[in-house]
Amino acid sequence: MIRNRLWLVLLAVPLLVANIVAAQGLPTGTLAGRVSESEGLALPGVTVTVKSPALQGTRTAVTNVNGDYVVPNLPPGEYVVTFVMSGFQSATRNVKISASQQVPLNAKLSISAVAAEAMVVAQSETVSQSAQAATTYSTEITNKLPMARTILSSVVLSAGVNTNGPGGNTTISGAQSFDNVFTVNGVNIQDNIRGTPTGTLVIEDAIQETTTMTSGVSAEFGRFTGGVINAVTKQGGNSFSGSARVTLNNDNWQAQNARADLQAPYVDKVVPTYEATIGGPIIKDRIWFFAAGRYNKNDYSGVLSEPITGSFPRSDTDKRYEGKLTLTPFQNHTVTGSYTKGQVDQSNYYFTSYPILETNGTTYDRSLPTDLLSINYNGVLSSNFFVEAQYSAKNFTFENSGSRFNELIKGTAVLVQDRGYGQMFGAIFCAVCPGAGEKRDNENFLVKGTYFLSTKSLGSHNVVVGYDRFSSTRVSNNWQSGSSWLLFPTSVKTDGTNLYPVIDDNSYLLYAPIPQQSKGSDMLTNSVFVNDTWRLNDKLSFNIGVRWDKNDAKDAAGQTTANDSAFSPRLAANWDVFGDGKLRVTASYATYVGQIQEGIAGSGATGAGAPASYYYYWGGDPINTSATGPWMSTA
């Protein structure tokens, strides 16, 4: 899917809008600017020193002949930037760097009238000077707002974002809800089918900030037509720190709909969620660690539908863990590794799209484990050449979902037609059949090089060239029951204790074998991109880039279902009217290429992993149709 966009935006006092230029998947920021003397002449040879609790050691740069400097690969955090040159008063600026941002920071130095240097301290806001519309919200901000503590709650605070998609899913700039990109630490966490973020990979107290990009997005980002969301988790530091939190939730604390017929059945029960984080140094300025955990257990009741009403106990236990190591073995070279694991264990689960008439054989315990691994490297090879690379992998599995019996009797599911296909006797789906246990995984490799070019008359250029390889795989054999048989009686009778299916000429059997098992689909996209963030002067800047995406998709039978490619040019211009960041006019044009949809390209014409359907309608004598019995049970 290709989507073009043309935007003209007038922004006043854009205190939260940030310009994103780092490559997709690499959660660092960049500081860049120009240093001049009080009359505006460029100052070469100024030493720029960057310090932060988020940075291992310090970083330095020296302005070139045009007064330009750049400090790349900075982890998100609050920074103190010092500008020093012999014969001039030094200046210090405080600035906030967020993930995937290039923050502009210019400075003017005055000639020192005395031997001692004067220190000028000022505060610099994170103000965009590009045409890319992006908003960053830190946890510090969102904790003060009356909102849910989720990534998506931060996302919907951005302009152009709403939750009007199917099932309340997030849409950005009018695109389909499944065609956004959601990442944590630059790693894709989306479900392969629906495109929604995998919530069990997020520990809310571990999140440092969330950035949402909605328009004018750089060519370094791809596989979307809506927007790009990246959450960055905390990391360790040179001092130990941690947190502990208990969050209490109760349905009754929510307001009900004013219309009685639309009110939900709330349960007056307090459900706690426990979270904890800790981080600190293993070796100061060399090796840091960070760890986080989250635990929630919700005990509740399942409801039996007529003819025998009642309830039965159910529970969902949600456990999440994260660990991160940050290592700087050499100055200007940093390696970060992180691993996140989440698992939801569900007791007495059943296929909730249909009502349940009894628990005998229809409910089961299942697990939904998922994990996320990422390794990131960034390095400064010279004063104007930088490299970054990242590998990541996400795994998600449905474990023990369905019947535990593949024999004819206990493995056959019974769904009663006049009870809304109410379930009885046997469970839908199969946990013990060949190839059971659906897997939805992805793998990503990304590398880029950045060259900083400074010119006297044409400003400065951050030229990025990169390669991005993303593979999404799914293995699914959709067994409909343990025996592949399903019985659809017309109705059901009860003596108050047992259920008896009513079988007449409206009843039928469904045989649903899988003729060809899934080999696993593979949605592969190879991409290359080049992007120039061009700062002409203090008022004019541009973003010029192009991306090429090559799709190669194979369905569950291993047959090719997609083999195409597309270019997506990006062009943006920004005019800072007064040169102070308070009033900007931006215009952008972009072509975005959406990701391959697993639900379409992954199934293919062969239907591997999908069940066939053979219907057999009842033509024998009626069973259990008498008003008083005796009746025959399914046991």
Please place each PLM-identified region on the residue numbering.
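Residue-level signature of outer-membrane beta-barrel architecture
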Residues: T214, T233, G280-I282, L327-P329, ...
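Transmembrane beta-barrel wall of Gram-negative outer-membrane proteins
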Residues: S241, V267-D345, D365-E388, P569
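Solvent-exposed loop/turn elements at secondary-structure boundaries
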Residues: A556, T561-S565, A572-A635
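Periplasmic N-terminal accessory/gating domains of Gram-negative outer-membrane beta-barrel systems
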Residues: F88-Q89, R93-K108, A116-Q235, N250-G280, ...
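Periplasm-facing N-terminal accessory domains of Gram-negative outer-membrane beta-barrel systems
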Residues: I2-R3, L10-A131, S138, K144, ...
